[in-house]
C-alpha cells in the first residue's frame, strides 16, 4: 500500500519589529544602502518612514532584500513600500564621486540627503512643520556621521538623534524596506546600463552580477580592463587599463 505524501505547510515568516522606539510622537527615518562593495557603478541609499497605523503598512512580505529568492517578489515588495510607506526617498553617488571621496563618505552624504528629504516630505504629508526633535535616524550598520538639520522653530541647526543597528535589515521593518528600495533601484540602474551598452553583459556579465566581484566579472576585467563606470579605487580596478565605451 502506497504511503500518502505529507503535505508541506509553508511556515509564515514572523514580522520584523515595526519601530525601534515606542514613542508614537517620533518619526523614525530608517536607512540602508546597496552596492557598497561593488566594483562597478553607483551606490544607492534609501530611507523609509512607516505610518504609525499598522493597518496602513502590514509589513507581511518585508524582509532583508538579500533574503529574496524571487526578483518578482522583490519588485512587488518595492512597489508595496512606495505605495504604503508614509514617505520614502532614494539617493545615489556615481563611481567618479566614490573614487574622489571614498565610499563611506558617499554613503554618509547620501544618508544625510535622505534625512533632509524625509523631513521635508513628512512635513508635507502631515501638513505640519515639525521641529527636529520629532525625528530620529535608524541606520543599518555600525557607523553614522551625525547630521544637523536647520530647525525653523529655533532658528538654528539641531542634531538629529540617531542609532546604528548591525544587521538591522533583518531586525526592523523600515530598515528592511529601505534595503529593498536601494537594491531594486540599483539593480534597475545596472540592467538599464546593460541594455544601453550590451558589451557590459558580454564582457563582464553585469546583467547577472550587477557589479559585484564575481569570477565572471573579475575575468572580464583581467581580459578587457575596466570601463569609465567602474570604481577605479576598488581592488583590481586600481591597476586595470581603462577602456572608454561609447
Please tell me what each predicted stretch does.
Residues 1-246:
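RNase H-like, Mg2+-dependent phosphodiesterase core
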Amino acid at each position: 500500500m502506497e504511503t500518502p505524501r505529507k503535505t508541506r505547510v509553508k511556515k509564515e515568516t514572523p514580522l520584523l519589529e515595526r519601530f525601534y522606539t515606542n514613542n508614537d510622537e517620533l518619526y523614525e527615518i530608517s536607512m540602508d544602502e546597496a552596492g557598497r562593495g561593488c566594483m562597478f557603478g553607483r551606490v544607492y541609499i534609501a530611507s523609509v518612514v512607516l505610518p504609525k497605523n499598522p493597518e496602513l503598512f502590514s509589513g507581511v512580505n518585508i524582509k532583508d532584500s538579500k533574503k529574496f529568492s524571487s526578483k518578482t517578489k522583490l519588485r512587488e515588495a518595492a512597489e508595496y513600500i512606495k505605495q504604503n510607506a508614509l514617505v520614502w526617498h532614494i539617493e545615489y553617488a556615481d563611481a567618479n564621486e566614490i573614487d574622489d571621496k571614498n565610499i563611506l563618505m558617499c554613503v554618509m552624504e547620501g544618508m544625510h540627503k535622505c534625512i533632509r528629504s524625509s523631513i521635508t516630505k513628512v512635513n508635507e504629508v502631515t501638513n505640519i512643520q515639525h521641529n527636529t526633535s520629532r525625528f530620529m535616524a535608524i541606520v543599518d550598520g555600525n557607523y553614522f556621521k551625525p547630521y544637523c538639520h536647520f530647525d525653523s522653530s529655533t532658528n538654528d541647526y539641531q542634531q538629529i538623534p540617531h542609532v546604528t543597528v548591525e544587521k538591522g535589515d533583518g531586525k526592523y521593518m523600515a530598515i528592511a524596506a529601505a534595503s529593498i528600495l536601494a537594491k531594486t533601484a540599483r539593480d534597475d540602474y545596472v540592467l538599464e546600463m546593460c541594455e544601453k551598452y550590451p558589451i557590459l553583459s558580454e564582457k563582464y556579465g553585469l546583467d547577472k552580477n550587477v557589479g559585484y566581484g564575481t569570477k565572471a566579472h573579475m575575468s572580464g576585467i583581467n581580459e578587457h580592463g575596466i570601463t569609465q563606470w567602474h570604481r577605479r579605487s576598488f581592488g583590481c580596478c586600481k591597476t586595470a587599463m581603462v577602456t572608454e565605451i561609447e
